[in-house]
Amino acid sequence: MDALINLKDCKEYMTITFCNQEHQIKLAGTVDTPYFCGKDVCKVLGYKDIKDALKKHVDREDKLPLSEIKKVGGTAPPTFLGQTYAYLSHNDGRAVYISEGGLYSLIMSSEAPFAKDFRRLVCNVILPSIRKFGSYSIEQQLSSAMEQLALKDKSEQELQFQLKQEREEKENAYIKLRSETKRLKQQIKRTLEFNQATKQIEPLEYIYICTTEYYQQQHKFKVGGVQTFDLLKSRLTQYNSGESDSEAHFFIYIRKTVNYRSIEHAIKGLLSGFRENQSNELYIMHYDWLVKFVDAIMDGNAEFALLVNNNREQIAEDTINKEPTIVPPIQLEQIMYHRAGDNPRDLTSILDSETKRAIQDAIDSFEPYNNTVKRREFEEHLLKQSPNIKLEGKKRNAWDIARAMGSTKNPMWRYKY
């Protein structure tokens, strides 16, 4: 049993750690026959009445006064424990020391947490082993305990390594965010400086957002820019080539700018994390965030742009959970006459009142499939309803008026020439 209490490196006392505090227990006797200071042991085990504890829980043969254990003035053997006194005072000599058996008796009777663990070890492991095998191998238990400690130490090391990695990742992400924020500030600053330098120049270029009915339900939008209005019109033709009516693209946002490339470059840089594919211009983002963000870039609002950039998690959450915002298509005829060099046309002076009234009646009764108004189908409907009107040489003007009237009736209608 002495393997449970290692006295090989002890001399005057042994030190144990309990509740994160070190306690010293004075020793006497030899390594083979050790004695422990009863008072010190009782204090460690939480006994309030030391004299009563020694009387109740330690047998007479397991306790001796120090004066009977010490050989005062004699030569101590090499394994002698405790101090060698030249003179032992009366009080020191009366101090009660207990044998190893007495020590275990006090432990077995104590309510201290580690004493309960010791009792379980003795009653559940050691004694059953002696009953079954006639002996108990402490080495096996110590080996198992050491393995458990090694596993615990390994787990703690792995946890520390993981925490270190997480700290490094957070630090790197913070450094990257600071660097990205600095770069964005510089980029927006250059855009602002450019806008300031060119504010007297009339904006003739365009930034647009377009989508389809299906894309709009999926929070998907194409964001880009063109140099002229004619290119803006042809852009839809490019997008819609080979597409069915239900997949036709339409504009939901158009703004003029002095230099669309600088705006487009800023948008691509700041919204790169929301692009469906890095090689195309399709973005996945809730429209409410997207339009505010594009407006912020167009207006040179660096603070809002950075706010959006720093709230990517919220943007992603809104994109996943919020219902899509449905925006009606923009009819290019509503803006085409405001280009530089163009004079507004008064279509009411081109067509007579009877033709305009017939077009309005046709619009009121027309129900286009999938909200797509095709020119030829509408003309057939118009002539079927009003066969007396003449459209020769006026088809384009009639179509323009029909689109203007149709946009008033249903902003969601799209038009195909």
Swiss-Prot record:
Keywords: Coiled coil. Belongs to the IIV-6 201R/289L family. Pfam families: Bro-N, T5orf172. Residues 4-134 form the Bro-N domain. Residues 152-193 form a coiled coil. InterPro entries: BRO_N_domain, Phage_T5_Orf172_DNA-bd. It comes from Invertebrate iridescent virus 6 (IIV-6). This is Putative Bro-N domain-containing protein 289L.
